[in-house]
A protein has these predicted regions:
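Non-heme di-metal
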Residues: 1-153
Length: 153
């Protein structure tokens, strides 16, 4: 069984990863990567995911440590760096990397869902709709992955 504190750390780690994805898509839009409409839609989804996760974090009375906030800032900037590099790649290769990254994101959220189901003292899980939100995020990340897979061909 997973304790509340272990879950909290996993949850915050997921938020930090989402922050890097936001940086990547922001950079690609800045460098006018095409198809712009797809990148903009996915960026909006990633921002929404992060907002939902942070809202849940605060609803639990949790907060970020200074180190976690610093890591979030670092990840946003590293996302910009990665996104800038991706912008220089041929489109199909760029789309392949996005396909793999979105697939990995869906797997990470799936791991988070498994952690929720293995937490000791699950009263708060039943009183919130976090499982529904995470399932929607998983479906969304899988959809992003499929979009990029289609763009590869």
């Amino acid at each position: 069984m997973i304790t509340d504190n272990v879950f909290k750390k996993k949850f915050i780690k997921t938020i930090i990863s989402e922050d890097q994805a936001i940086g990547i898509y922001q950079a690609e839009l800045f460098w006018k990567r095409r198809p712009k409409d797809i990148f903009q839609t996915i960026l909006n989804d990633e921002i929404s995911h992060e907002e939902q996760l942070i809202k849940f974090l605060y609803s639990r009375g949790w907060d970020f440590t200074l180190m976690q906030k610093s890591t979030m800032n670092f990840n946003r900037y590293s996302g910009w760096f990665i996104g800038s590099l991706l912008s220089t790649l041929p489109r199909r290769l760029c789309f392949f990397f996005h396909y793999m990254a979105e697939k990995q994101a869906a797997n990470s959220y799936n791991d988070l869902m498994i952690s929720i189901e293995n937490i000791q003292g699950m009263q708060w899980v039943n009183s919130s709709n976090i499982k529904i939100k995470i399932q929607k995020i998983i479906d969304n990340e899988k959809s992003h992955s499929e979009i990029f897979r289609a763009l590869i061909n």
